[in-house]
Amino acid sequence: RKAKRRVTALGLKNVEDLAVMDAEKLEFPDNSFDVVMAQYVVTAVPNPEAALDEFSRVLRPGGELIILTRISADAGLRRFIERRLQPVVRPLGFRTAEFTWSRYAQWLATAGEMELVENRPIPPLGHFSLLRIRKTAIAVAA
């Protein structure tokens, strides 16, 4: 409701519609969008891979999934610190220590029709990253 009021108050004519739905079960047909933008979503949903699969499903071939998120270190001091902080930040809804780059890479390897275009750390500290992932083809059912 707040977003709809804001669209009206600001006169945002480019916003056609707003909808609330489960990121793991999107109510859109296959191949609906040229771009899917997921800001700080992947680490907040119960089953991130299911959400990533849904984002891929609703993308048209050639479309891009743009993710802005926190990506944890796979190893080293930063990984140690992130794991130590996890009990403190998890009750706040942050599961960032669970989301290393290798988890995204594993999803990409199994997603089939998705390819990484860009993985850019966001300044100043690089704890957040911008991922651009392109859908290369329509998935074929097995």
Regions found by a protein language model. Name each.
Residues 1-25:
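Class I SAM-dependent methyltransferase SAM/SAH-binding core
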Residues 49-61:
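A short glycine-rich, Lys/Arg-flanked "PGG" loop and its adjoining helix->strand segment in the class I
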Residues 34-47:
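A short SAM/SAH-binding and catalytic strip from SAM-dependent methyltransferases
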Residues 11, 46, 60:
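Short conserved AdoMet
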Residues 21-35:
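A short acidic, Gly/Pro-enriched loop at the edge of an enzyme's catalytic core
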Residues 130-142:
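C-terminal lobe and adjacent flexible extensions of AdoMet/dcAdoMet transferase-like proteins
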Residues 19, 37, 66:
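Conserved Rossmann-like nucleotide-binding pocket used by diverse enzymes
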